[in-house]
């Protein structure tokens, strides 16, 4: 992405970011996602904030999405030689996300099942991989633009695909609105090193990790003892309040651990468990 410079933020004006030749594409990479027999469900906004590539981007947030390309490295069993991957891209509001939890656990939602009644399907593609070519890709060009928090990717693999999958997501964003001085109106989380720049979203304090609001809004993280134990393992008991829920500092530590854990086995397990708790617990 192009170099960016934060404009001076005025008290009464929206925060602005100066830009030149802004690159409207962004790339997200998540290594070693284990896609089990029930698949894995990814939210585009969360994936962006969890991805290692986003750390070097000029803009630490996503604008509305116009297209998306999903690429996977799919290990295929040598005994069979061919594996199939279903890449389903759909959109829905956060209020309706609860309807998807049953997809992961109800028998019959397999590779060839429709499984998307009542949602806006943007792309649904069945791809094949083999031993010599383990890369598959799916591209969706949207008629309109969608908020990243409303875009979801469901990955389903056949039993002949095993182990961990590397996922790469390339997106094209809408051009950000700018004023006459060439400054872009801030539409998301601001630069973290500017404590004067706040972007109008709830809890958009630049000193909070951007995943904070997403996790806080997700009621699935409050409902089970397994989830509480998982969080305790990450943040420590001293970051829980008297009713055994996370304090604000606990949430920040939780996000920091998920975001900054050393890449490798520990990070892949942490990310996989995080997804599992978010999407598999009703």
From Swiss-Prot:
The protein's superkingdom reads Viruses
Tell me which InterPro entries the record gives.
BNYVV_p31 (IPR007004)
State the protein's purpose: Involved in efficient vector transmission. Might slightly enhance symptom expression and increase root-specific silencing suppression (Potential).
Q: What is this protein called?
A: 31 kDa protein
Q: Which organism is the protein's source?
A: Beet necrotic yellow vein virus (isolate Japan/S) (BNYVV)
């Amino acid at each position: 992405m192009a170099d960016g410079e934060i404009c001076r933020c005025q008290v009464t004006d929206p925060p602005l970011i100066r830009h030149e030749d802004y690159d409207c594409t962004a790339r997200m990479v998540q290594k070693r996602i284990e896609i089990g027999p029930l698949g894995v469900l990814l939210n585009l906004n969360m994936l962006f904030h969890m991805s290692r590539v986003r750390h070097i981007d000029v803009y630490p947030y996503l604008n509305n999405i116009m297209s998306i390309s999903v690429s996977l490295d799919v290990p295929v069993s040598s005994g069979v030689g061919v594996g199939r991957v279903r890449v389903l891209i759909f959109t829905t509001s956060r209020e309706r996300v609860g309807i998807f939890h049953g997809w992961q656990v109800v028998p019959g939602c397999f590779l060839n099942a429709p499984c998307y009644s009542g949602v806006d399907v943007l792309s649904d593609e069945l791809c094949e991989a083999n031993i010599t070519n383990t890369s598959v890709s799916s591209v969706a060009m949207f008629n309109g633009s969608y908020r990243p928090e409303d875009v979801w990717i469901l990955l389903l693999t056949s039993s002949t695909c095993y182990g961990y999958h590397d996922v790469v997501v390339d997106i094209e964003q809408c051009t950000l609105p700018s004023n006459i001085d060439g400054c872009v109106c801030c539409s998301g989380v601001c630069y973290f090193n500017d404590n004067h720049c706040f972007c109008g979203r709830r809890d958009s304090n630049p000193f909070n990790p951007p995943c904070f609001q997403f996790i806080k809004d997700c009621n699935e993280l409050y409902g089970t003892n397994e989830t509480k134990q998982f969080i305790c393992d990450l943040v420590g008991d001293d970051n829980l309040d008297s009713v055994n829920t996370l304090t604000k500092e606990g949430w920040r530590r939780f996000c920091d651990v998920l975001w900054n854990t050393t890449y490798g086995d520990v990070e892949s397990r942490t990310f996989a468990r995080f997804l599992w708790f978010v999407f598999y617990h009703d």
